[in-house]
Swiss-Prot record:
Assembly behavior: Heterodimer of A and B chains; disulfide-linked.
Record function comment: This venom insulin, from a fish-hunting cone snail, facilitates prey capture by rapidly inducing hypoglycemic shock. It is one of the smallest known insulin found in nature and lacks the C-terminal segment of the B chain that, in human insulin, mediates engagement of the insulin receptor (INSR) and assembly of the hormone's hexameric storage form. Despite lacking this segment, it both binds and activates human insulin receptor (long isoform (HIR-B)) with a high potency (EC(50)=242 nM).
Tissue expression pattern: Expressed by the venom gland.
Signal sequence region: 1-21
The keyword Iron-sulfur appears for this protein: no
SMART domains: IlGF (SM00078)
GO molecular function, one term: hormone activity
Record note on modification: It is noteworthy that in this dimer, in contrast to Con-Ins G1, the chain B is amidated and not the chain A.
Protein name listed in UniProt: Con-Ins G3
UniProt xrefs under SUPFAM superfamilies: Insulin-like
Originating organism: Conus geographus (Geography cone)
Domain of life: Eukaryota
Proregion residues excised on maturation: 22-29, 52-92
């Protein structure tokens, strides 16, 4: 009786874990949901979405982006913050669009060069 009881507890625990994992992933993968992104979260998200595109363009021209060349003189956080701060679209900056107001990942991608 105790062996089957322990087996039942383990099976229920695993089932609960799988259900919780599946439920959580559905909500975190939805990039269409507008979200406020500020500070380092905004900078990290921007770099994650746009950094590869900037590198490819730099390789085609034979040079890297000037901001990324100065990385040795600036801390990584300061470089990300400066890059995100100066991005403009229709007179509105990335902070106004995605921090002051909620924005989607698709909207954030419009700031990629």
């Amino acid at each position: 009786m105790t062996t089957s009881f322990y087996f039942l507890l383990v099976a229920l625990g695993l089932l609960l874990y799988v259900c919780q994992s599946s439920f959580g992933n559905q909500h975190t993968r939805n990039s269409d949901t507008p979200k406020h992104r500020c500070g380092s979260e905004l900078a990290d998200q921007y770099v994650q979405l746009c950094h590869g595109k900037r590198n490819d363009a730099g390789k085609k021209r034979g040079r890297a982006s000037p901001l990324w060349q100065r990385q040795g003189f600036l801390s990584m956080l300061k470089a990300k913050r400066n890059e995100a701060f100066f991005l403009q679209r229709d007179g509105r900056g990335i902070v106004e669009v995605c921090c002051d107001n909620p924005c989607t990942v698709a909207t954030l991608r419009t700031f990629c060069h």
